[in-house]
A protein has these predicted regions:
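Aromatic- and acidic-residue-enriched carbohydrate-binding clefts of CAZyme catalytic domains
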Residues: 115
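Conserved beta-strand positions in the central sheet of alpha/beta enzyme cores
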Residues: 38, 68-70, 95, 137, ...
Length: 350
């Protein structure tokens, strides 16, 4: 699998997830077998102006090569300046977000709103490619709504502008994350362009990811919500790519090790930020607040998870989390396996 000059060891990537795909989570997913991982969405305006909060999104592991930064803005000129700033900070690949359905983002003309105008898409890609000097990818949706499905036209415009790959989430902006993703549209985009196509949408399990590849012919699959609380999905996919047996689900001890390592990594990540270097205790509290959603996801479908989640909103330190894990999921405890019925009832909707 290749994008520009970069060859990847597999075809299953961690998608750019706002508020999720930070350095610690990317590291865990890569450790499990993700062939590649994007950052979460970063404001091109903030990058261009060097704001402290925006720069915190650029924290990365040295082995992240290429370091791929996803940017968003409404104006091609701002996207270009943001891309140049990202490259100056170490990015080796830039992705333009043209898929975010959030009202605030679309209301500014960014995200999915930008993809309503294929000519603007082509211009934006061309300017970002020229400014950054690195491969450019774009993430798009099927269209704005059912009456304006334009993903093939937009993908062709991105290709004409110089994009090295196009990622398609097979839902419209109007759908948000509801309903069913159209894998047929992923296949249509794959058949319409020569550049690499990445499929996204309704990839909850390793079986889903493998089926998307078979049914659409896409070059790679972006795993998004399916990785939340389950980075082991990438271990299963790596085994499948190698023709190896499916590995067993994580044991309780392995699960707890990953959860608590994630906690420690998140705390370290925040303590590296300039605003918290002189206040490690506040950095830890902030990190734990950020991690609460991950704690909910890690326990989704597990017996005991309901009681764990009721208390997770009160934790403030890494030690609090460790005690909570031991109390509700004690070592050697039985019934740790995921209950499919519980998992379905607690499906991630956001």
């Amino acid at each position: 699998m290749q994008i520009g000059p970069y060859t990847f060891p597999g075809r299953f990537f961690l998608a750019p997830l706002a508020g999720v795909s930070d350095r610690p989570f990317r590291a865990i997913c890569r450790e499990m077998g993700a062939a590649f991982a994007y950052t979460e969405m970063v404001s091109a305006h903030g990058l261009a102006h060097g704001t402290e909060q925006t720069e915190s999104y650029l924290d990365r592991d040295p082995e992240e090569v290429p370091f791929a930064v996803q940017i968003f803005a409404a104006e091609p000129e701002v996207l270009a300046r943001g891309a140049a700033a990202a490259v100056a900070a170490g990015a080796g690949l830039v992705d333009i977000n043209m898929a975010c359905p959030v009202k605030k983002v679309c209301g500014s003309g960014a995200g999915a709103a930008l993809a309503r105008d294929p000519l603007a898409v082509e211009r934006a890609v061309r300017m970002v490619a020229a400014a950054g000097g690195v491969p450019v990818t774009v993430k798009i949706r099927s269209g704005w709504d059912d009456g304006s499905v334009n993903c093939v036209e937009v993908a062709r415009a991105a290709e004409a502008g110089g994009a090295s790959a196009v990622a398609l989430h097979g839902r419209t902006r109007a759908q948000g994350y509801a309903g069913r993703a159209s894998w047929e549209q992923v296949r249509a985009v794959k058949e319409a362009v020569r550049v690499a196509v990445l499929g996204s949408g309704d990839v909850w399990t390793s079986a889903d990811a493998l089926r998307m590849r078979r049914e659409t012919g896409c070059d790679a699959v972006l795993v998004a919500r399916g990785a939340c609380g389950n980075p082991w999905i990438f271990r299963e996919l790596r085994a499948a790519e190698r023709g190896e047996p499916t590995p067993p689900p994580p044991s309780r001890d392995e699960w707890a090790d990953v959860v608590l390592r994630h906690v420690r990594m998140q705390v370290d990540h925040r303590r590296r930020q300039p605003r918290w270097r002189d206040d490690p205790a506040e950095a830890e509290r902030h990190a734990i607040r950020e991690l609460r959603k991950h704690l909910l996801w890690y326990t989704r479908g597990r017996r005991g998870g309901v009681h764990f989640r009721r208390e997770a909103g009160t934790v403030a330190t890494a030690e609090d989390v460790a005690r909570l894990v031991e109390r509700h999921f004690p070592g050697g405890g039985r019934g740790f396996e995921i209950d499919p019925a519980l998992a379905a009832a607690e499906e991630i909707r956001e």
